[in-house]
Regions:
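Membrane-proximal soluble regions of multi-pass membrane proteins
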Residues: 1-29
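Hydrophobic alpha-helical membrane-embedded segments
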Residues: 60-89
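Cytoplasmic membrane-interface regions of multi-pass membrane proteins
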Residues: 19-26, 88-103
Length: 141
């Protein structure tokens, strides 16, 4: 698992180098995205998805009419949390040993980047789908 996460981390580092060749000048890093995949920040985003659905269930009699707002609100809340943590966090440069290791092995970074994005999107779809099913169940009661 650690090796898999290192591959995704390396892919994001290469992606970042391609789009930001002059280094970080403040702002966000693609490394944050892989941290969100592999750490507690994704758990926080999931918890806020559940809280958002409960708010809709509490304040609206027919929450299904507003289900399309749930992913949008979750994304906004998740971005605010991510913004807070990224500004608070001390940036770390990409691990040169990992980069050198994967350069030697010739691993295609784009494939791993695609897998990372796919896993992230799939997990968000699962959360959103679960919330919509929850709302539909409560709507029928």
């Amino acid at each position: 698992m650690k090796e898999f996460l290192n591959k995704i981390y390396y892919s994001f580092c290469k992606f970042e180098e391609f789009f930001f060749p002059y280094g970080r000048k403040g702002g966000y890093s693609s490394v944050v995205m892989i941290e969100m995949l592999a750490s507690y920040q994704f758990g926080i985003a999931s918890a806020f998805s559940a809280v958002t659905s409960l708010v809709f269930l509490t304040f609206f009699r027919r929450p299904f009419d507003y289900y399309f707002l749930i992913p949008i609100l979750t994304a906004i809340i998740g971005f605010c949390i991510l913004d807070y943590y990224t500004k608070k966090k001390v940036w770390k440069e990409p691990n040169e040993e990992i980069i050198a290791l994967y350069k030697e092995k010739g691993i295609d970074a784009i494939n791993w980047f695609t897998i990372g994005i796919f896993v992230w999107l799939l997990s968000k779809l699962c959360i959103t789908g679960g919330i919509i099913l929850l709302i539909l169940c409560f709507d029928r009661i």
